[in-house]
């Protein structure tokens, strides 16, 4: 597994954000080195509790990664990770940047001052109305 792929998989696991991703990467040397570890090994990492360690250790990453990449491809979406050249520098330098960005269409250069809408994939009707009102 490439580090880029590991980043996508870790992003898919509930409870893993940038802070826990960083702890795992530092503990094992790279994002790809996280996989294949036992729940016990994972649990020894600061901030990784028993439940999260179990989710990571038992995650069917090959199947889930293939499904995610296929779904993105069918939707015309590119997945940008922290490892990709196209990942915006303005986000890369945040304290807690998103591990992945799902981009449809062209991603213009981001200005220093910008607004982003961050949320779940299934937004509510209210969330959709509010998003449209600021664009």
Language-model features and meaning:
Residues 1-133:
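Short, positively charged patches
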């Amino acid at each position: 597994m490439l580090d880029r792929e590991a980043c996508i998989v870790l992003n898919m696991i509930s409870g893993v954000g940038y802070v826990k991703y960083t702890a795992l990467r530092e503990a094992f040397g790279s994002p790809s080195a996280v996989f294949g570890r036992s729940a016990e090994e994972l649990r020894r990492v600061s901030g990784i509790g028993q439940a999260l360690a179990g989710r990571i250790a038992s995650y069917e990453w090959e199947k889930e990664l293939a499904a995610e990449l296929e779904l993105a491809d069918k939707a015309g979406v590119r997945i940008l990770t922290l490892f990709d050249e196209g990942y915006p520098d303005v986000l890369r330098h945040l304290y807690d940047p998103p591990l992945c960005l799902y981009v449809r269409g062209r991603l213009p250069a981001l200005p220093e001052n910008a607004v982003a809408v961050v949320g779940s994939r299934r937004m509510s009707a209210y969330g959709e109305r509010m998003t449209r009102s600021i664009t």
